[in-house]
């Protein structure tokens, strides 16, 4: 159930948030244009430290890594510390140009950007008393939009559509099938989603105004 609810929440955000525009703006923040590769490791090691006095980039020895093996990096947001941590072996892979390792770092940079740059946080503070299912839903939504922003930072819309469509472009070394499916859904439907949302919003506002006018006349 949490998975279904979080996907509905993600689609609603797709209706009201222009993630393509966000990706362009975030690239400009790092002085990158649309033709340049996204230098995830350089940004994490240098640029974020310059941009955010509370940012830390930490390399964790494999022996001290307390997350499951499938997690290559993490982002932690605290009041006095904004941290990206990465497993040492994954860091070495990133230095050698490994696609999956670099994409994982880019994903954590997206988390930093959503919370600190765009102020778009769907996370739950640890001190907040909330039921477990709701907490999982919020976490999943935040992961989904971080996945989406990352895909748009690293690839063009055309590349994402080609990878899912004709299969001419293989992005499996960068992202999972679920991440690619989410990016493809957005690229294929974001205009329609936004148009439908605006139509429904205008229709709802008009109906409310008409109802208010009717109530005024009756009274």
Model-identified regions with their sequence ranges:
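Active-site hotspot residues in diverse enzymes, especially metal/ion-binding acidic/histidine motifs
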Residues: 1-219
């Amino acid at each position: 159930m949490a998975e279904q609810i979080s996907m509905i929440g993600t689609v609603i955000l797709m209706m009201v948030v222009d993630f393509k525009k966000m990706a362009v703006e975030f690239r400009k923040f790092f002085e990158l244009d649309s033709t340049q590769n996204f230098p995830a490791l350089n940004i994490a090691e240098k640029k974020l430290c310059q941009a955010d006095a509370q940012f830390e980039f930490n390399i964790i020895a494999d022996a001290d890594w307390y997350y499951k093996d499938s997690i290559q990096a993490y982002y932690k947001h605290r009041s006095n510390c904004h941290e990206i941590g990465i497993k040492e072996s994954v860091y070495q892979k990133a230095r050698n140009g490994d696609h999956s390792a670099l994409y994982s770092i880019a994903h954590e940079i997206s988390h930093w950007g959503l919370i600190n740059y765009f102020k778009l946080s769907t996370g739950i503070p640890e001190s907040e008393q909330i039921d477990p299912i709701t907490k999982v839903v919020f976490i999943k939504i935040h992961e989904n939009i971080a996945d989406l922003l990352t895909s748009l930072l690293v690839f063009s819309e055309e590349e994402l559509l080609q990878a899912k469509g004709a299969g001419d472009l293989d992005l499996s070394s960068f992202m999972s099938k679920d991440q690619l499916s989410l990016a493809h859904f957005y690229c294929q439907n974001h205009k329609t989603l936004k148009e439908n949302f605006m139509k429904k919003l205008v229709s709802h506002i008009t109906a409310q105004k008409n109802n208010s006018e009717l109530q005024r006349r009756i009274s």
